């Protein structure tokens, strides 16, 4: 549609006077009206058509009050249907609104008088607060106000949650090594393995590679060892990307009973770090990094039942894992202060494995099914800047 730019003409020889611009009739069909000066008044005697977009200049005064350009429509012609106006306030954002966003939007909405048309009025997201949208009915009353999550704050939360999920998955990623040692008792010593995979959390997609090394030593029915691993991941979000890293090292031990019973214990220290490049809905880029550390402990009990006269076995298992990922405080590239709560995870697992061991005990294959429950794993982040939170 066409665009109309009502222009303020100032008398350079005297004080500036913002006069009212007026039209007798406006047929608006997906057109745009740009009112570029806060306090500017535009009057339309008769409005018809399907509606369009109103970009209205607005500002927050020194006394904290909001003001915006004004549009006054005398009569709305709804013969062909009710016109709808999409009003965008420009020059302010959601950080400029008071805590009572409904009252602030009602104050702004009073500047756009178009009884007989419906309106959707929007204040764009700020550095901290999400976009605020008010629905205005045909009587000119605000019928609903909704606040959306800030796009960057939401993505930071997703990155933090993804780091936690990686942390939780590595609280006990020693099960394969422990299983190998139960299957091949003389295989203790130096070892290494590499893993590649993908994960999804809400709208975040992560591709990662893990390198894990370790060494262990058997003493009778006991086995002790140490391990270290490094995970490098690339996160893709709707409004940006992240480079995610996880480092951990740990000690592990196992008791292997002569009757097939076993107890595995793993203690680890973890460190996570993410560098991110994100974009607000207005197109502004923000970058930065977050990092934190954590500790985990897992204890697993099970028993391997060899099926007589075969190379197959069944292995019921029960495991309890506890992890604590420390709180984190950091500042984004545009000065938003983030406080991330510590996350506690208490995971219980019941499972059963069915497997096959080669007669020479040089190889094996198995399948495993488990039921898990996490009694903790709640997290939250708080954002603040210049008194806005």
Description of each model-found segment:
Residues 1-110:
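Extracellular beta-strand/loop-rich repeat segments of large surface/secreted proteins
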Residues 67-69, 209-211, 224, 247-249, ...:
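One face of beta-strands
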Residues 88-199:
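Interface/linker segment at the passenger-translocator junction
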Residues 98-113, 206-222, 337-345:
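Short secondary-structure subsegments characteristic of cysteine-rich extracellular domains
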Residues 148-308:
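Outer membrane beta-barrel translocator domains of Type V secretion systems
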Residues 238, 275-279, 326-334, 377-383:
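Outer-membrane beta-barrel and related beta-rich outer-membrane complex signature
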Residues 250, 254, 339-389:
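Outer membrane beta-barrel transmembrane domains
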Residues 314, 319-325:
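Solvent-exposed flexible segments
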